[in-house]
């Protein structure tokens, strides 16, 4: 089960930026190295003053990235649902019921009475949700005890199965539907290239757009498997139950998904890219490198402070602040006579600075992330509506709009509370309400209008 998270480093960085932005402070005097770079005696900068323009910039930044995040999520969610609906409408394989069911749903719904069917569907939903809960707990325990290799092997095998086996079934049914002749050698070559490139992009390194495309395709394939092999009533009950479980797992203090997110925040680590759709690149092999770089870059700072503290008594004893005649002659030889003129100040300001540039990870840290499970169940709801609503496009479009509205509200709450929130409850609730209302009220009403040739 997946949740809507922003990166932990983004939260820590934003909190630190907000705290420093709204706190008045006086900068410390520059060190001797900075004095020699500037070529001027040190001057204390004026204290920072909080103005209304800075608060306006904060609000503008929030609105900018909030709207940007909405667009970043609308496009992949829409593409995933479009792939599923297009497959349902064109490939009859995923709508035909051949009696096969998942091993997690052993009870059949082709019973004599409605009561037995409802009971069997509830039992199937309970078993399915129990399996999801157990798998989530196993994942959290493995992550808690840093069993990263086991998690990577687990995700590697799952993606291997999806990209090769389920993709082979999907491609074969598409070719059969459109009557495309294909030999086994060419088909094997296509599947091999598709699967290998996908495994490289997801578990190692690749272009961002290609990684996102593979994650969307994996979610669509999984949603199609659920649509075909889950009984109808069981599927609707699972959608309702999974939204409740997602709410509890993320918001409860001891919820498994909340523990997973908080653990990642404490360790300043990114969640595995095979579990999360990210609007920015997440590479597994870069995680250790980034942490090592941060650790290495943090060591010289206290060392430099120690040097400054050790040199301070000597500078005070000489009573010249380090501006010896030899130093003045050297600076005059390089810069000319030091006169406080407009030309000299402009030349000094144009001199290159030896300070390292600020890290360029700010835009990447702002990337919004959505669990692949959310993609799967969104697409499952829309695909199930398209498959069981007697081919009615009104019901399908109603579910599609309901999911996007729920996603907007979830992102709005995310901007307000600024913490990890579940992405399923609002969208799935809206989708279920819109589905049953449209299928049982709107569609019969419109059919009667069409029969009597009555136009509104």
Curated annotation (Swiss-Prot):
Origin superkingdom: Eukaryota
Positions of the catalytic residues: 246, 374
UniProt-annotated stretches for the region Important for cleavage of target proteins: 277-279, 366-370, 421-423
Coarse class of the protein's main subcellular location: endoplasmic reticulum
Record site: Cleavage: 280-282, 287-288
Annotated region (Disordered), positions in chain: 9-56, 332-365
Enzyme Commission designation: 3.4.23.-
Topology class, membrane: Multi-pass membrane protein
Gene3D superfamilies: Presenilin
Modification after translation, per record: Cleaved, probably through autocleavage. Heterogeneous proteolytic processing generates N-terminal (NTF) and C-terminal (CTF) fragments of approximately 35 and 20 kDa, respectively. During apoptosis, the C-terminal fragment (CTF) is further cleaved by a caspase.
One CC-aspect GO term: Golgi apparatus
UniProt xrefs under SMART domains: PSN
One Pfam family linked to the record: Presenilin
Gene transcribed to yield this protein: psen1
Primary enzyme class: hydrolase
UniProt free text on domains: The PAL motif is required for normal active site conformation.
Protein name: Presenilin-1
Topological domain ranges for the Lumenal compartment: 92-121, 179-183, 231-237, 391-396, 443-456
Segments passing through the bilayer: 71-91, 122-142, 156-178, 184-205, 210-230, 238-261, 370-390, 397-417, 422-442
Family statement: Belongs to the peptidase A22A family.
């Amino acid at each position: 089960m997946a949740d809507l998270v922003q990166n932990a480093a983004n939260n820590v960085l934003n909190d630190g930026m907000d705290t420093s932005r709204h706190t008045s402070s006086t900068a410390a005097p520059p060190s001797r190295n900075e004095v020699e770079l500037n070529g001027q005696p040190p001057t204390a900068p004026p204290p920072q003053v909080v103005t209304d323009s800075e608060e306006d910039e904060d609000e503008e930044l929030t609105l900018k990235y909030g709207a940007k995040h909405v667009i970043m999520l609308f496009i992949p969610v829409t593409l995933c649902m479009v792939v599923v609906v297009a497959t349902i409408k064109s490939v009859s394989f995923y709508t035909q019921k051949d009696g096969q069911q998942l091993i997690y749903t052993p009870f059949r719904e082709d019973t004599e009475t409605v009561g037995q069917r409802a009971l069997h569907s509830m039992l199937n939903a309970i078993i399915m949700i129990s399996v999801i809960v157990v798998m989530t707990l196993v994942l959290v325990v493995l992550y808690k005890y840093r069993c990263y290799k086991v998690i990577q092997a687990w995700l590697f095998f799952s993606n291997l199965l999806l990209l090769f086996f389920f993709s082979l079934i999907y491609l074969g049914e598409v070719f059969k539907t459109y009557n495309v002749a294909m030999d086994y050698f060419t088909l094997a070559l296509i599947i091999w290239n598709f699967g290998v490139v996908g495994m490289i992009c997801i578990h190692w390194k690749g272009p961002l757009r290609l990684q996102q495309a593979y994650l969307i395709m994996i979610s669509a394939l999984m949603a199609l498997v659920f649509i075909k092999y889950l009984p109808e009533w069981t599927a609707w009950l699972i959608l309702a139950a999974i939204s409740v479980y997602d709410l509890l797992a993320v918001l409860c203090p001891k919820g498994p998904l909340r523990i997973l997110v908080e653990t990642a925040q404490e360790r300043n680590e990114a969640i595995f890219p095979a579990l999360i759709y990210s609007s920015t690149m997440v590479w597994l092999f870069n995680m250790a490198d980034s942490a090592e770089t941060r650790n290495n870059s943090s060591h010289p700072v206290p060392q430099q402070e120690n040097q400054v503290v050790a040199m301070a008594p000597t500078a005070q004893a000489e009573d010249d602040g380090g501006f010896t005649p030899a130093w003045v002659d050297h600076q005059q030889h390089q810069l000319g006579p030091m006169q406080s003129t407009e030309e000299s100040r402009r030349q000094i300001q144009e001199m290159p600075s030896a300070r390292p540039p600020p890290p360029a990870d700010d835009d990447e840290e702002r990337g919004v992330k959505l669990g692949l499970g959310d993609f799967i169940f969104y697409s499952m709801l829309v695909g199930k509506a398209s498959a069981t609503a007697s081919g009615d496009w009104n019901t399908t479009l109603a579910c599609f709009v309901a999911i996007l509205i729920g996603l907007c509200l979830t992102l709005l709450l995310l901007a307000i509370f600024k913490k990890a929130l579940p992405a399923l409850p609002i969208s799935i609730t809206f989708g279920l309400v819109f589905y049953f209302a449209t299928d049982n009220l709107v569609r019969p009403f419109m059919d009667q209008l069409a029969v009597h040739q009555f136009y509104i």
